[in-house]
């Protein structure tokens, strides 16, 4: 079954810090794509200069919701790589639903 996973994760350091890593993160995210998962940065929500929340959308082939979320979260963390500390993972949010619903 195909699922749409929406990950919403604040970027530590705000808009400027995100601006310096945005392209590299997008490149790393694209490298995680396979026949089972397609990901991209969908949007950025900015609140002042010290806050930005990055929205990543993933289309995932999985057996169930838990597997879809696990695959998307793994791909996000892999794309973040050594810069994982640059994300406020404790404030991350996720939404998973069957594609087309």
Predicted regions and their residues:
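Unusually extended, aromatic-enriched hydrophobic runs near protein termini
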Residues: 1-9, 34-39, 94-101
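Short, intrinsically disordered low-complexity segments
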Residues: 34-71
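Charged interaction segments
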Residues: 57-101
